[in-house]
Regions:
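Intrinsically disordered, low-complexity proline/glycine-rich segments
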Residues: 1-166
Length: 166
């Protein structure tokens, strides 16, 4: 399954859609900044909330929790490294490798690819493509990708951008 997020600048108070391979709106995402952290709500095509990405407030480093259908399934954890950022998806056992700032990375589970993220050129403009491997939960994969991006951009105190250069 391939999902696409159109390139533009988002903030946590913005709304945007995630399209499928046919250009149809498959998911809707709405960001909110509340007094106790940032939240990103993910809705299905019938506007039912199916996932939530929320900032973990009490933490030394930016952390985001992923909930799917009201159940916490993952926490994005930044590994301590000196050179390039590395992430681990706690709760799912997923490892994340690649160039996060260019949105060109892969999420793996036990050496098998779960989802790859890269820039793609499609008819509706510059987008980032999420290629979700068969047998994987696309909602969880989408929420984890959005959470990784939220962690990246929360580390930059001067930036309120969401999903980088999108």
């Amino acid at each position: 399954m391939k999902l696409y997020i159109k390139q533009r600048v988002f903030s946590f108070v913005d709304k945007f859609s995630v399209k499928d391979e046919n250009g149809t709106d498959r998911y809707f995402v709405e960001g909110r900044i509340i007094s106790l952290g940032k939240k990103l709500h993910i809705f299905d095509s019938e506007h039912n909330e199916i996932a939530l990405v929320k900032q973990k407030i009490v933490s030394l480093r930016p952390k985001f929790v992923v909930e799917v259908n009201g159940e916490e399934v993952a926490e994005i954890v930044k590994k301590i490294t000196f050179f390039k950022p590395q992430y681990y998806v706690e709760g799912l056992g997923w490892n994340v490798e690649g160039d996060f700032f260019a949105h060109d990375y892969v999420i793996e589970s036990n050496g098998a690819e779960v989802v790859s993220i890269h820039k793609a050129w499609v008819s509706w403009g510059d987008t980032f493509e999420l290629d979700i491997a068969d047998g994987n939960d696309e909602v969880t994969a989408l929420a984890v990708v959005l959470a990784i991006d939220a962690v990246l951009h929360s580390q930059n105190a001067t930036s309120s951008a969401f999903f980088g250069n999108i």
